[in-house]
Curated annotation (Swiss-Prot):
Pfam families per UniProt: 60KD_IMP (PF02096), YidC_periplas (PF14849)
Disulphide-bonded residues: none
Principal subcellular localization: membrane
Subunit structure: Interacts with the Sec translocase complex via SecD. Specifically interacts with transmembrane segments of nascent integral membrane proteins during membrane integration.
Chain intervals for the UniProt region annotation (Disordered): 63-82
Gene (name only): yidC
Species assigned in the record: Xanthomonas campestris pv. campestris (strain 8004)
GO biological process, one term: protein transport
Role this protein plays: Required for the insertion and/or proper folding and/or complex formation of integral membrane proteins into the membrane. Involved in integration of membrane proteins that insert both dependently and independently of the Sec translocase complex, as well as at least some lipoproteins. Aids folding of multispanning membrane proteins.
UniProt KW keywords: Cell inner membrane, Cell membrane, Chaperone, Membrane, Protein transport, Transmembrane, Transmembrane helix, Transport
Stated name of the protein: Membrane protein insertase YidC
Membrane topology: Multi-pass membrane protein
Record Gene3D superfamilies: 2.70.98.90
Length: 573
């Protein structure tokens, strides 16, 4: 049987299987997890200091910070009783973010540049107080024996509840303070930058009491995962949903919400890393100081999945101060903005694959795609341009693949004679076949290797188109006004069916089993149905790729002295 045909069947079936596996992955509804009892967790004054987790180490495992600094003599911080009662919610607004916070937790976060729907005005709400699926980011302090701020403990230093980045300003700075008993205070500064989704949160502990103060900072992301609808009509279910983290030693790792505690609570001390919660196109992340170690913990708190950093811990002597700073990212997976953060491994949140080699291929493809967009100013034309460049680059492999298949077809009559000569003696038939291949210098796998080299590239391109938030709600032309939504009139899927059908007719199939031939007739229809509900950008890729493949097939047939009309007639028999 024609080797090109065999591996074309294999490729199509493999694509279908992988697509179905990826659709089924990470989107099954997760049952509400059973709360896990705390084990050896520091008895903090703050009731929410640390989420319960299995096998959590004792307070001694929290990384210790460096030596604190002396409090400047000019400091005018005075000791006041600990604040009681809930602090009023504060709203911070930049050109890209609107945050609702209480000084300790970011309760709501709206992404002002990203509407929920193509024609809508409501922005995407990434963090939310929604009762069914709450999702927030918290930075607090915990201690076994020293006073720490609890919920509502931080108060804005400036009057008012609304702070907005003014025109002409690039930075919005809003300070908060907690005044504890006996002269201990913690000053917290929120800083928002124009055009940035990274929020700087800096804490300074000032001890003007007569005793040493001990405590550690914790930063956590907590959410009740949204149950994603099953099926091809929901692009959000294509993507990875869960926690990811990075360490210089182990690199990028991830844990899906549906398998959140299957491998335990992590409990790993890391310096120079970060932790994040991912969903389709958007994510939140805590990025601590590169030189300060934290204990990374995954936990479940009732129905909530928690990703948390604990530490560093501080011992602040009387008259001393200590500080720590972290960035909270609340926003899209925009490659250009992630690069500006200069955080190692953060580009992996654009989750092209959990495998490094596939992620590298995906990053390279997006680099080309983004440069094409900067020239063409349209993501649809950029996709077409990328496919054309890929086809040109892979043309030598396609030529080698077809050449190998053409050579095999020329020897089909001799193979048929060998089969007739040796009848049911498969061993002698195979031995004679291999001798023929050796004599005529035929590589039976010659059509396979080029295909195997191309497949990782096309798989990576598939995930580039799924994952890239840059394509979200981007138009192409005419009826395609959103490349991440399905084709409203199914024009591209129908074109895809026609191209696949024509490709089948132009693919020589000498000696193909009648049952296999009948199965192959249904492949265009099967793929057409699958593509009908996929994002239009993906279907556009398949249509252009298939159309160019059809032209190359026609050209190769003529180059090797074969006639397309004869192949079509042979396949029709």
């Amino acid at each position: 049987m024609n080797q090109t045909r065999v591996f074309l069947i294999f490729a199509w079936l493999m694509v279908a299987a992988l697509l179905w596996m990826e659709w089924g992955k990470d989107k099954a509804p997760a049952n509400a997890p059973t709360p896990i009892a705390s084990q050896a967790v520091p008895a903090a004054r703050d009731p929410d200091a640390a989420a319960p987790a299995a096998n959590v180490p004792s307070a001694q495992a929290i990384p210790q910070a460096g030596s604190p600094a002396a409090v400047p003599a000019t400091s005018t911080t005075t000791a006041t009783p600990a604040t009681t009662g809930a602090a009023p919610a504060i709203t911070l607004t930049s050109d890209v973010l609107r945050l609702k916070l209480d000084g300790r937790s970011v309760l709501d976060a709206e992404l002002l540049q990203f509407p929920q729907t193509k024609d809508g005005t409501e922005p995407v709400k990434l963090l939310t107080e929604d009762a069914a699926h709450p999702y927030n980011a918290t930075s607090g302090w915990a201690s076994e024996r020293s006073p720490v701020p609890g919920v509502g403990g931080f108060r804005a230093e400036q009057p008012g509840t609304t702070f907005e980045l003014a025109k002409g300003q690039n930075t919005l700075v809003v300070p908060f303070v907690w005044n504890g008993p006996n002269g201990v205070s913690i000053r917290r500064i929120f800083t928002l930058q124009r055009g940035s989704y990274a929020i700087s949160i800096k804490d300074e502990v000032i001890n003007k009491s007569d005793a040493a103060w001990n405590g550690y900072v914790f930063r956590k992301l907590s959410r009740v995962p949204t149950i994603l609808s099953r099926g091809m009509t929901n692009p959000d279910s294509f993507s990875f949903n869960g926690a990811t983290w990075y360490s210089p030693q182990e690199g990028y790792e991830r844990r899906a919400f549906k398998d959140y505690m299957d491998d335990g609570g992590l409990n790993r001390q890391i310096t120079g890393g970060w932790v994040a919660l991912l969903q389709h196109h958007f994510f939140t992340a805590w990025i601590p100081q590169k030189d300060q170690a934290s204990l990374y913990v995954l936990a479940q708190d009732g129905p909530r999945d928690v990703a948390e950093l604990r530490g560093p811990a501080f011992t602040v002597a009387p008259g001393q101060s200590a500080s720590t700073e972290a960035r909270l990212w609340v926003g899209p997976k925009l490659v250009s903005l992630l690069a500006k953060e200069d955080v190692k491994g953060l580009d992996r949140v654009v989750d092209y694959s959990r495998f490094s080699i596939m992620a590298i291929i995906g990053q390279g493809l997006f680099w080309v795609l983004s440069h094409l967009h900067s020239f063409l100013h349209n993501w649809g034309w950029a996709i077409i341009g990328l496919v054309v460049l890929l086809r040109l680059a892979l043309y030598p492999l396609s030529a080698a693949q077809y050449k190998s298949g053409a050579k095999m077809r020329r020897f089909q009559p001799r193979l048929a004679q060998l089969k007739e000569r040796y009848g049911d003696d498969r061993q002698k038939y195979q031995q004679a076949t291999m001798e023929l291949f050796k004599k005529e210098k035929i590589n039976p796998m010659g059509g396979c290797l080029p295909l195997l080299i191309q497949m990782p590239i096309f798989f990576a391109l598939y995930w580039v188109l799924v994952e890239s938030v840059e394509l979200r709600q981007a138009p192409w032309l005419g009826w395609i006004q959103d490349l991440t939504a399905r084709d409203p009139y199914f024009i591209l899927p129908v074109l895809n069916i026609a191209i696949m059908w024509a490709t089948q007719k132009l693919t020589p199939t000498p000696g193909m089993d009648p049952m296999q031939a009948k199965m192959m007739q249904f492949m265009p229809l099967v793929f057409g149905v699958m593509m009908a509900f996929m994002p239009a950008g993906l279907v556009l890729y398949w249509v252009v790729n298939g159309g160019l493949g059809l032209l190359i097939q026609w050209w190769m047939i003529r180059q090797h002295g074969e006639k397309p009309s004869k192949i079509i007639q042979a396949n029709a028999k």
